[in-house]
Amino acid sequence: AATLLGSGVYQAGIASDSTGTSTLLTVVSEHPLLSAGVNNLHLANSAWGGFTLLDAGGDAMRWARSALSAGQLSHQQMLDMAAEVPPGAEGLLFLPYLTGERLAEHTNSRAQFFGLQRKHRQPHLYRAVLEGVALASLRNLQQLRRHAQEPEAMIASGGGARSPLWLQIKASVYNLPLLQTRNQENGTTGCAIVAGVGVGLFSSFAQGVSRTVSIEREFTPDPRQQEHYLRCFELFEQLYRQAQPLYEQLDVISSFSFSPDEGTPQ
């Protein structure tokens, strides 16, 4: 709640994308959002924040750094490489369910790349990971949209908010303006606002936000990218649903254990 307040998300019509290890999407409403897969928290000004969770948000890029570059590339180098690839990663999709899904029906979901071809290189994979997190988050955002007022804009926070490329991808995928705050320490700012209201420094939470939170940059949806990402999402959704029956079979396969020497040729 403090992070939401410290990023300026405190009244109906505003949404939040908080991407750290996970990605939490929150839509502020005047009432709780009663839906499976949606949790609610009570905000400081008597509003409610309905939120969804994608377990592997920023953690997907952390995995990509470890698995695809053996930790040799910095996150900024990965982002620079991804920026060289066109939207859609030339037909490569990534489902980012590296650790399953805590708040979904299928907690044993798995991650996968789909559409790999010989032409694809590291930059394509990095771009696909960024886009895959955004597309998976769009699935969650649609749950919120079905039960809440359509947000006018979304404010980004967390480590993921430091990447202009990722924010532009998300703006086009969500089809929402995505705002980047000047101060990225949103949780600390939110706590300061609460303290300021408590001691009378601010007359209201709204005044506290207006005096401490400012927008650095706005990322607006690109119409051509948004149309292309919509087609990508339709395929993403098919992959997500059609893969679900296979996860139990994969659980059985992965439950077999072998000693290390059994995999070594004699």
Give residue ranges: language-model regions.
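Active-site core segments that coordinate phosphate-bearing ligands/cofactors
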Residues: 1-157, 161-261
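Intrinsic disorder/low-complexity segments
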Residues: 263-265
